[in-house]
Design a protein with these regions (language model features):
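Proline-threonine-serine-rich low-complexity tracts
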Residues: 1-203
Length: 204
């Protein structure tokens, strides 16, 4: 910050005293963040000297700046319950050197993000402890349909003396790229049931 002050001038009982600044910066100079000690020395014609000092403290009250990418929406990678997502990680800037940017939530660029919404938050802290954050979301949608394969059609003669036949088969079980899929029979009869003469359609 630019700081102005009245420059001290020493006096003496005899003429010829000279005042000089021995440390610090002159009035009107740009003082750095922190504390600067200004020292002035007055010396008389006989070599006697006296000094005085004062401090100029400049506080960094300006917050750092950080900008996150736009929210990202992506479909899952084939056969995977998630998706690899890449983005440019934000890096904060500040009026003073020494700002540090870290990720406080979420996953790094190039990671496999799970199905659903992940919030990535980044925080930049400057050398004076001022903090600014930004966040964005990565949404991965599961757009892959589950897979199920039924047995081949079955043809069988009726059991002796019955208008039906006992039929067994391996019930199909679906698979999916994500856990939690459930297979149910929505039409027909379960394996080891007596199927009536005619055509019964089993749907899973």
């Amino acid at each position: 910050a630019v700081v102005t002050y009245t420059t001290p001038v020493g006096t003496d009982n005899c003429p010829g005293a000279v005042t000089v600044q021995t440390t610090g910066l002159p009035s009107g100079a740009t003082f750095p963040v922190g504390t600067t000690t200004n020292t002035f020395k007055v010396t008389d014609a006989m070599g006697n000297s006296t000094t005085c000092s004062f401090t100029v403290t400049v506080n960094d009250t300006q917050f750092p700046v950080i900008s996150c990418p736009a929210n990202i929406v992506k479909s899952n990678d084939a056969g995977v319950c998630g998706a690899i997502v890449t983005f440019t990680a934000p890096v904060g800037t500040d009026n003073c050197p020494g700002a540090v940017t870290i990720r406080t939530t979420g996953l790094a660029s190039g990671s496999t993000f799970p199905i659903g919404v992940t919030t990535n938050t980044y925080q930049v802290t400057d050398a004076s402890g001022n903090v600014t954050t930004c966040s964005f979301t990565i949404t991965v949608n599961d757009t892959e349909f589950p897979v199920i394969t039924c047995p081949a059609n079955i043809v069988k003669s009726n059991d002796v003396g019955l208008c039906s036949a006992l039929v067994t088969y391996t019930a199909p079980v679906g698979t999916d790229n994500c856990p939690g899929s459930v297979t149910v029979q929505t039409a027909g009869l379960p394996s080891s049931s007596y199927f009536s003469v005619g055509v019964t359609t089993n749907t899973f």
